[in-house]
């Protein structure tokens, strides 16, 4: 639907590249499959963090290849959806090079970069402290996302707008091959559709909104 803000996560850690693997050889393995975030973090020395960005001793993402793949993913989105994404968003593992590539592509296509838009709008993230990487399946099974989410809301500092990132979905054999974030997706979906969460939001006068509403009133694009 035109009024649903469907954006794109620039994915550099799972599945196959949109680009010809020969042109993004540093991003994929010998089978053309993206190198996982767990493998990147295991094989490269982390020296710090800056917000959502992970700082490595040497950035594992070649900038030019990352830029090519980022733009090709946006092109594929447009091809499939018939419109530009409502926003660009980093996925799983963000570094200086992945962020720089996203900034360039976002500017080229006149699409907001989610984290920049949220920062400029003074939006605060609802802290999610229960999803370590890697995330053992047994721990995922025992995680009560609904309870944790409501507690996170209760403990947040006052703000006009907050946002929460979750991965509502289902689990199948293909997913198990692609990510360590598996069973928790079912828990995320349970949380997002929970009557308990709905009742908490209503009771505390918390309204649901859209990233589109944070955009400039002068933006003529309808997402």
Question: Which ranges hold each PLM region?
Answer:
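Acidic (Asp/Glu)-rich catalytic clusters
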Residues: 1-5, 26-29, 78-79, 154-157
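C-terminal domain-boundary segment and adjacent tail
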Residues: 113, 178-223
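Structural preference for beta-strand elements that scaffold enzyme active sites
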Residues: 3-9, 85-89, 112-114, 161-165, ...
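Catalytic domains of cell-wall/extracellular-matrix polysaccharide-remodeling enzymes
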Residues: 63-130, 136, 147, 154-157
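Histidine/acidic-residue-rich catalytic or RNA/ligand-binding cores of hydrolases
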Residues: 16-22, 99, 125, 173-180, ...
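Active-site gating loops and adjacent loop-to-helix segments of metal-dependent hydrolytic enzymes
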Residues: 17-58, 180
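Active-site beta-loop-alpha junctions enriched in small/polar residues
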Residues: 9-15, 91-93, 118-120, 129-136, ...
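Aromatic-lined glycan-binding groove of carbohydrate-active enzymes
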Residues: 151-174, 207-209
């Amino acid at each position: 639907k035109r009024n649903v803000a469907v954006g794109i996560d620039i994915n550099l850690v799972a599945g196959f590249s949109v680009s010809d693997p020969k042109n993004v050889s540093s991003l994929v393995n010998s089978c053309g499959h993206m190198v996982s975030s767990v493998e990147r973090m295991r094989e490269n020395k982390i020296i710090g963090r800056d917000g959502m960005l992970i700082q490595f001793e040497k950035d594992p993402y070649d900038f030019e290849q990352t830029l090519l793949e980022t733009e090709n993913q946006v092109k594929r989105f447009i091809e499939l959806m018939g419109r530009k994404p409502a926003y660009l968003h980093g996925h799983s593992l963000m570094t200086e090079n992945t962020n720089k590539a996203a900034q360039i592509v976002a500017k080229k296509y006149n699409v907001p970069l989610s984290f920049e838009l949220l920062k400029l709008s003074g939006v605060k993230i609802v802290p999610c402290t229960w999803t370590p990487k890697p995330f053992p399946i047994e721990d995922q099974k025992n995680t009560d996302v609904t309870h944790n989410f409501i507690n996170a809301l209760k403990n947040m500092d006052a703000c006009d707008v907050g946002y929460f990132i979750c991965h509502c979905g289902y689990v199948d054999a293909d997913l198990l091959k692609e990510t360590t974030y598996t069973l928790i997706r079912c828990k995320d979906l349970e949380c997002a559709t929970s009557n308990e969460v709905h009742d908490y939001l209503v009771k505390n006068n918390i309204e649901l909104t859209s990233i589109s509403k944070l955009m400039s009133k002068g933006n003529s694009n309808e997402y």
